[in-house]
Amino acid sequence: MKVVFVSYEVFPFAKVGGLADVAGTLPKYLKKHGVDVTIVMPKHRIVEKNAEKFGYEIKKVAESLSVSHVKTDQKFDIYESVLPGSDVKTYFVANDYYFSAEDVYAGPDLGEQAIFFCAATLDLVKHLDLKPDIVHVNDWQTALIPVYLKTVYRDDPYFSRTATVLTIHNLGYQGVFDPKYLSFAGLPDYVYTIDGLEFYGQLNFLKGGIVFSDVINTVSPTYAEEIQTEEYGEKLDGVLRMRSKDLYGILNGIDYELYNPATDRYIYVNYDVNRLELKWENKVKLQEELGLPVNKETAVAGLISRLVPQKGLDLLVDVMDYLTLFDLQIVVLGTGDEQYENAFRKFQERYPDKVSANIKFDVELAQKIYAGADIFLMPSRYEPCGLGQMFSMRYGTIPVVRYTGGLADTVKEYDPQSMEGTGFGFKKYDSAHLLKAVSKALHFYYREKDHWRRIMTNAMNTDLSWDRSAKEYVDLYKKALAKVGR
């Protein structure tokens, strides 16, 4: 089975969010399950910068190629590399006009960029003769590929047996643009209807992918159910309900080689489930590095997140003053909306012995927090899958979450009777319930030491690997092939 896996960001070539982690790991595990997978992504400016840092080579294999169907004079080059730690070939669509910004999600025109990339990807596939059985696209930036295949390429024998899979990593980002982009894309007018890409007078790229893909999945079973409701459906719940028979939920995994406290080169002291006492050495070193009072007995709660409303930060901001009354230090890492960045900076000024606000993106510090914290905070308003809670569990750091989406599928409330469970959480979206969940975690941390150790071992022994997920994706690909009569 040949799969072309298309993503706008792939770790370690270019990373902004969790999509890059998925796209940089799932293909490795698909390969282990016998799938002949090839990655295609844009050649962002950061790709060359990261080559030395992450030890990969990149070379040009074709140049000055025209883009079919799109109304543009822009050409593209093709570059090639290999995904580090694997033998997965990765091809890059290179164009300095569209992909030279410092930020992966910046540039002269995001709509044009996505259209150019989608169309160029199909030209790349033909130019390199990749002959895919499956084209697997991710999120709105790549969602027009199934639209192209079902319309302007419908009678092209090269793609006649190719099936499409769309993975929705976050329904909140849809790629909504002026209808004029339809003409630029070279797509037929008939797709601009309520049953196609039309969306409240605009053009919705993700909706196009939902309508035209053979099968669709999102990144947890609970989120697949939630997005078919008005509350979580982001105005696409109707079309998702129409496609419900072709909509699946597959939990993401994490890369066990990359995220392993026994070998992680970024953390202060390596440890494993049989040497948990070494985890506290990481806490002491973290406190020292961040200028917090050093005390291995004091509970440390970590928050590593984009600082945006989706992440439930309004709840956390509401209860921060109360949380500082506990014997608790709170370490924040992330960037995002100015209101949250400023709020956490002010909390640090007000409570310098209690709060460390690190308003930046820092992979190394993130790993140190996963290893050094006792508790991991994730009170999300919604969470398609979430990786932070998985990373924290892998490192024996206990998640306190709102039970939604993938958080509900991965974190199980600890039951002291059965001694089963991996964390603590709450369902109702309000700050009082968050405070209650943190209080419960702190009760076990300070007063039920044996139970706390059991929760840590439960969390670290939970199977969160990509191996499990990859098997489910292989089954999904078979369902997609059945849709095209194969």
From Swiss-Prot:
Keywords: Glycogen biosynthesis, Glycosyltransferase, Transferase. This is Glycogen synthase. It holds the Pfam family Glyco_transf_5. Synthesizes alpha-1,4-glucan chains using ADP-glucose. Belongs to the glycosyltransferase 1 family. Bacterial/plant glycogen synthase subfamily. Gene3D superfamilies: Glycogen Phosphorylase B (3.40.50.2000). Its EC number is 2.4.1.21. It comes from the Bacteria. PANTHER family: ALPHA AMYLASE DOMAIN-CONTAINING PROTEIN, GRANULE-BOUND STARCH SYNTHASE 1, CHLOROPLASTIC/AMYLOPLASTIC.
